[in-house]
Structures are given as structure tokens and as C-alpha cells.
Amino acid sequence: EQHLSLRRQRQMSIRDRINYSFDNKKIINSFHCHCEDCQRSTGAGKASILVIIKSNFNLNGEPKFYGTKGSMGSTVNRGFCSNCGSGIFSYLKELPNFLFLKVGSLEDSSWVKIESNYFTKSCNEWNMPDEQLKSFKGNPNLLENIKTLIKSLN
């Protein structure tokens, strides 16, 4: 089911140092991640994420990166604007062809439809998950879900 608009998205950082575009018809997944790592990296109760194929992402500018171990032990590389500090996307060493785009970095996010909540076991009372979305206590085997979706696109 297609639930996203057919326009291309464009983002610009606060200081116009970095911009990107992608075709939002090709989004693989969308979720709120409540894991402790996302809570720390965003300074909030969750990160809202769009999963896209790296080849569907056009980047202008040079983000800075820092690497860390994620909640499941994967190597997470987080890209951010070196001028304003805004988080833009992450990628996992174990899934180099996919980007985890921060919804908050979009110029216009009004079209985004989040599908589910991940790591609800890490939620705080002040930031409970949307009960109308599918919820998972941890990561619902994201790697296998992505592989299945890729096969369906081919």
C-alpha cells in the first residue's frame, strides 16, 4: 500500500551547509525508535526514522560522523551538520546500503506516516509510544525485514 506522497523531498540544514533529496516512493520502513542509544543521541524520548536505500539518496555537503555501538551491538555511524549540529542520518556498518534518515531533518515532514514503535521496553512514562501503531519491545528483526522488502522490490 502506498501511503506516502509522490514528490521528492529536499532538506536543508539550518545554515544551508548540507542538503539532500530522495524519492519518498521508495521508503522501506518508518518507525519511532525508543532505544536508549537513540534517546541519548537525540536528547529526546525517541528518534523518528525513515529507512531508505543509499542509492535513493542524493547528498550535497559534507556531514560529520561519529560512531558508536547501538543498543543491539551494531556499529552505528551518525551523520550530522558540523555547523549547527543537526542530526541527518545514520547507517549501520552491518547494513552499508541503507540509511536511517532522521524525520526531523526534513524541510517538510507533514507527509510522513510512521508505521511502528521499536524498543518500547525502553520507553519512559513521559514519552509513551503511540498505541495506534504496531509496537515491538525490541528490534523486530530489522535486517530480515529489509531483506524481504528488497526481494519484493526486484
Roles of regions detected by a PLM:
Residues E1-I14:
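Single conserved hydrophobic/aromatic residue that forms the stacking wall/gate
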Residues R8, I18-N154:
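A short Gly-Trp-Pro
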